Amino acid sequence: PIPGKSLVGIELPNTTKSNVGLGSLLSDKEFENSPKPLLVALGKGVTGKSYFADIAKMPHLLIAGTTGSGKSVTVHNLILSLLYRKGPKDLRFIMVDPKRVELTLYNNIPHLLTPVIKEAKKAIMALRWAAKEMERRYDVLESHSSRDIGSYHTNILAKWQNEHDENDRTQVSPERMPYIVIIIDELADIMQAYPRELEAGIVRLAQMSRAVGIHLILSTQRPSVNVITGLIKANIPSRLALQVASQIDSRTILDAPGAESLLGKGDTLFQGSDMSKPERMQCGNVSEEEVKNVVRYIVKHNDMLPDDITIGEGMDESVATTTGSGSFDYPSDSDDDELYGEALRAVREA
């Protein structure tokens, strides 16, 4: 049915395909003129309308799609959109890439809080650091009587910058507090190794980190209930589904069928936290060479910032330090259960 008319429309495929490039989305007036700091380009609908979403409003995103569905390209779209919006002083990333070949392209950009994380243990550590950073930021907001990071930037930081010279070393400026976006490219690999720690870390951040400018983008090619648990789903209302293998997988990610019928190669169903039903669109296409060109440009025109998180390699030593936001350790067997040692002794004696 056609809305507003007593007619029925039949969709016919175009005889010639048109490529939806990321550049056409980033040059859209809606994207260029928007004041939203974390606006990202999603794609174009069947009518040619461009779709954008504000990560600050989402405030977290769950992405699922099988191999070849365009999941990795979609993640690149989101990252490049954010890089076009904000510089390293206003936006920082923590990237987790167990596959080691997708997000490592961004290893040299100054936006990274730490080099791209490839090990499951370090991913858990990064989530623990983010939780401590979240608590610290809440203390900062409380001390300045600000409701959220947007209010803090507008009423505290911008006001101080208008009244003072940033180069004046005698004045102590309020903390800048950049937005932090945590991107995990393959949730299933880490969930296999540390299911309880990963779920707890994600849920804690998803419940509370929105107000302090920390956001999660999680992707997986296996959207089963073992990977996308009920707690994770309940706390991440924004979903982006590419082609999946079965209707069960579609219901896991969207709570509705449909994603199993998508065509692949960026054909997407997006359901935001404020949407009653998913919207179908074609995600923008971006090549590996284009990603490398953007990275080279950013590295050339920006000074490298010191890593805010340094993750050590040893298992038994202090393995992580930060620039004033606390430290965190590798997860160990002793973290799993207080009675683990006693149970182990009982099994040995038996």
Where are these regions (language model features)?
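Alpha-helical transmembrane segments of multipass membrane proteins
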Residues: 81-82, 190
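Conserved lysine of the Walker
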Residues: 71
